Amino acid sequence: MSVRNRVVLAPMSGVTDMPFRELAWRFGAGLVVTEMVASRELVNDTAESWSRLKAAGFRPHMVQLAGREAHWMAEAAKIAADHGADIIDINMGCPAKKVIGGYSGSALMRDPDHALGLIEATVKAVDIPVTLKMRLGWDENSINAPDIARRAEASGIQLVTIHGRTRMQFYEGRADWDAIRAVREVISVPLIANGDVETAHDAQEILRRSGADAVMIGRGCQGRPWHAGVLAGAAEPRREDIADIAVEHYRMMLDFYGEAVAIRHARKHLGWYLERFAPALAGTEKAGIMTSRDPREVAARLYHALDAGALDGREAA
C-alpha cells in the first residue's frame, strides 16, 4: 500500500463525495477516502450507497464501509472490490447517534470480540488491503484502542487510523495526540493519527507525539478542499483564485448529482467557503446564496461575495 505523501483526507459523511475528493486529490492530498458507505445498504443496492461508492479518476480508490453484521460487511467489501475499490476501510470511529444506534461505528468498540469477528470476515472476503479507523475507546474508562489494534493486526488489518478522542467526547475538548502513541507501541503496520489538525505545525506535532506514520485531516478541510495538499507541502491557492475554486466545486456537484439534489448538498460547502473567506457578508446576501434554486444566480452571487471578501481583506484565516 503506497501513497504519495503523509497527509490523508478523512472520510466525512456528507462531505467527501466524489467532487470533494477530486478537488482534494488535485490539490495534493496523499490519500482520500470515500464517505462512509453502509454495508447493508450497498448489498441491498440503494442509490445513495452507489453514489458514495463511485470512484474518482485516480488511484488508490479507498472505500470506507460501516456495519454491525459480519456477513453484510463481507458482502459489501466484495461488491466494493468488484467495482474498483483498491482499499477497504472499516469504520469503528463514527460517533453519530444514528450510526451508533445501529450498533456500528464507534459502538463496536464496546464489544471488541464482535468487532474482531467482523474484521476477520471482511479481511477474508477480499484480496485487497483492509484497514481500520477507530477512536481511543468508548469513554475514558474504556480506552481499548491499543488492544483492538493489536488483535486487528493479527487478523490481517494492514493499516490503523486513530482519532484521539473517545466516542463520548464526540468532538468536544482537544484530541489527545499523546494517547495515540499507545497504539503505535503495539502494532507494526502503518498508523495514521487524526484529530484537531489545522496547521502544518499541528501535523508535525501530532506525528511527533503519536509516533504515527501519517496524519489525517477532516474538518480543517471544510471550505478548503486544498488544505490537505497544503499541509503536505503544496502551494496555498492565491486568495484571488478562491472564488474560481468554489464555483468550480459547485458546478462539479451539479454535474455529479443533478441540479435538484446538488443544490441541497452544496449548501453546507457554500456556507463553509463564505464563513472562511467572506465573513463580513451581510446576512441577506448569504441567505440569497444559500436559498437560491437557480444555479446561475448561485454562481454569480458566490463570485461576487468571495471576490469582495478578497478585496476588503477581512476574510478569515
Swiss-Prot record:
Molecular functions (GO terms): flavin adenine dinucleotide binding; tRNA binding; tRNA dihydrouridine synthase activity
Keyword hit for tRNA processing: yes
Keyword list, A-Z: Flavoprotein, FMN, NADP, Oxidoreductase, RNA-binding, tRNA processing, tRNA-binding
Disulfide bonds listed in the record: none
SUPFAM superfamilies for the chain: FMN-linked oxidoreductases (SSF51395)
Domain of life: Bacteria
Source organism of this protein record: Rhizobium leguminosarum bv. phaseoli
Organism classification: Bacteria, Pseudomonadati, Pseudomonadota, Alphaproteobacteria, Hyphomicrobiales
EC number in record: 1.3.1.-
UniProt similarity note: Belongs to the Dus family.
Catalytic activity reported: a 5,6-dihydrouridine in tRNA + NAD(+) = a uridine in tRNA + NADH + H(+); a 5,6-dihydrouridine in tRNA + NADP(+) = a uridine in tRNA + NADPH + H(+)
Signal peptide start and end residues: none
Protein name: Probable tRNA-dihydrouridine synthase
Functional summary from the UniProt entry: Catalyzes the synthesis of 5,6-dihydrouridine (D), a modified base found in the D-loop of most tRNAs, via the reduction of the C5-C6 double bond in target uridines.
